[in-house]
Amino acid sequence: MTDKISEQQRTSPDAYSRHYIVAEIIRQVFSNKKINLLDVGGAGTYVDYFRGSSSPVETVTVIDILPPPDKIEGITYIQGDATKMTFVDNQFDAVVSTDVFEHISDKTKDKFITECLRVAKDLVVVGAPFESEEVTRAETLANDYYKKNTGKPHLWLNEHFELNKPKAENVEAILAKGKYEYLKFSSNQIDSWLQSILLNFMKETNVLERPLVEQFNQFYNSHLDQMGDFKTPGYRSFYVVFKNKALMRGLDQLIPSAGGALAKLDLEAMFLTRLADDRKQLTDQKNSLEETANQNQALTEQIRAVAGQLKEKTEILKELDAEISGLRSRRWYGLYTLLGGGRK
């Protein structure tokens, strides 16, 4: 399991944090019982966040409009529409969904929320980027960078613009109408989100080396509660809805403190130092190559000089050969030969 956690932490903070947060909420709320959980739109790829010896989750069902991924084990996977789920009311102890809501069309966004509420017995957790000036600006900058370096927009970010991000007031109107008790908080402080997502885009487009970015990711994710990640404005908002009010917890019990960012300073120093080291290494390599190139240039000049000398000597030899040929053609040379000239 340690290897699995390490692998998860090497993913981008955007991906890791949202699933880690939901898993922690589930652990805190259901600490004393085993539950069945529905992951709406999870595609089954992040199910390991909800499993393990410390997790209260006993069974996991995934519903997603996409076909199941390869090599998925230990879950029930249903390919279906989350706005028209066939489950009975209150079928699952907990229903969770992260970064799916913004990929639902405006006309069915309300239905998505009401369906999640309908099939949950005790708890609903929905996390997504919601409409705000800061979030839209950050997504635009990230998408522009990706498009500049790949020639096409980022698939998921582009859908946020095409389908529109959800609006908090619409969700809260549904919750108020149903008289649901809920908590709301933000994660992925917007500056940090943009920095980390751009770094991971640089990895995807080979601007930065994969090991360097994964080292950044692992440090960030393993110190999530020390990154100031829960300060506002945040990129992602979470709604934690308690259908079973007896399970209500305070926000301070469910998520790390919003304060403190000491580890972020360490991360920035580590990352910049690593970049400086890499830059120095590249500079040293460049200087070495230039030195080799200069040596090669000098050697080339020497070769050219020798070649020139050889050419001159070849011309001299040709001239001598011509003179010898001329001598041999003269009569007296022939007579001299007949008389036995040169005999010993």
Residues covered by each model-derived region:
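Boundary detector for helix-to-coil junctions that initiate low-complexity/charged tails
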Residues: K245-K344
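Conserved phosphate-coordination/catalytic loops
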Residues: S12-Y20, D99, H103, K107, ...
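Class I SAM-dependent methyltransferase Rossmann-like catalytic core
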Residues: M1-S31
